[in-house]
Amino acid sequence: MRILGVDPALTVTGYGVIEFRKGRIGLVEAGVIKTTVKQDLAGRLERIYRATEKLISDTHPDIMVLEKIYAHYRHPATAFHLGQARGVIYLAGALAKIPVVEYGATRIKKAIVGQGLASKQQVQKMVAHSIGLEKLPAYTDVTDALALAIAHGYITRV
């Protein structure tokens, strides 16, 4: 099964595509989709949509996984922008007829590390170990996206 994990954001969206085959996890592709604050909102959302659409077309995932939205009540604009980025990512998945699932951060940490209150560093180390990376990706957004994909495989026992 090929799984696309996406860590949405308006500025840097991380993604990771992995493949579970015969009990092993293989890295297919990972990286980031970047936008700049110099672009207007519509342009940034279009960039995220088109890059996600191309990623799906190039890697042919069976499913897409996103983290359930969490934003602090003191920062409603963050939740608003995150929701917009997630919306265009969902749209790309829907138009490609790919199911999209979500997991909360605690569920992801529990699947990857074995405890829901694991630190970000613990998750990063386990992600790197699970797919045989010698060093961590430059962006934590990539590691988070890979964690989403790996967690889905573990949770569904692919």
Predicted regions and their residues:
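Phosphate- and other anionic-substrate recognition elements at nucleic-acid/protein interfaces
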Residues: 1-158
